[in-house]
A protein has these predicted regions:
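Basic, polyanion-binding surface patches
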Residues: 1-169
Length: 169
C-alpha cells in the first residue's frame, strides 16, 4: 500500500568511512525541523547502511539527478562497500562530518545522528544537518531549478523527473 504515496523523491545516503564507506538509495526521507535543520530517513535493519549509521553516528544525504541514474540504481540494488567500484561517483571530504559527500550530487547534507526509533520493519534515523553544500545553479533563487532533472522513484526500476514548469496559484 505504501506505493500509493509514489512517486517520491530519491536520495542517496552515504555512511561509514574508509573501507566501510557505503552508499544506499532512499526514498523515505523527510524534513523534520527548520531550526535546527533536521531530517529523517527510514532504513531497514538488514541494510549495511543501517549498521554504519549506528556505528559512526552520522550520515550524508546526497541529492542525485537523472545523470546519476545508473549510480542510483546500483546503490539501491547492490549491498556493501564493494558496489562503490561499480559506481561512477567521487567521494569527497565533507566539512563537518567524517563521512564523505558525493561530488556529482547537486546537494549534500551532512548529518549528525540525534535520534533513532524503530517503526515496524524500519529504523527512522533523525539527523541534525551540521553543514550543507549545493550547486548554486541547481537551486537558484532559493528553489530547485527543474532543468537539473531531480529524480523521483515511481516504482521498481522506474524513475521520473519533474516537468520544467512551475504552476503558480
Amino acid at each position: 500500500m505504501y506505493r500509493l504515496l509514489y512517486p517520491m523523491r530519491t536520495f542517496l545516503v552515504v555512511s561509514g568511512n574508509g573501507e566501510e564507506a557505503d552508499v544506499m538509495t532512499a526514498d523515505w526521507l523527510t524534513v523534520l525541523s527548520n531550526k535546527p535543520f533536521m531530517i529523517g530517513v527510514a532504513v531497514a535493519p538488514k541494510r549495511y547502511t543501517h549498521k554504519l549509521i549506528k556505528k559512526y553516528g552520522e550520515f550524508v544525504i546526497s541529492v542525485p539527478t537523472l545523470e546519476m541514474l545508473k549510480d542510483v540504481w546500483i546503490a539501491g540494488t547492490k549491498s556493501g562497500p564493494s558496489k562503490l567500484k561499480d559506481m561512477n561517483i567521487t567521494l569527497v571530504d565533507s566539512k563537518k562530518v567524517a563521512t564523505k559527500s558525493i561530488g556529482e550530487a547537486v546537494a549534500n547534507l551532512e548529518c549528525k545522528l540525534v535520534d533513532e526509533q524503530i517503526y515496524g520493519d524500519h529504523t527512522f534515523f533523525v539527523g541534525e544537518v551540521l553543514h550543507y553544500t549545493y550547486n548554486e545553479a541547481a537551486f537558484r533563487d532559493n528553489k530547485p531549478n527543474l532543468k537539473y532533472n531531480f529524480l523521483a522513484h515511481v516504482g521498481l526500476n522506474e524513475f521520473a523527473t519533474f516537468e520544467d514548469k512551475i504552476h503558480e496559484m
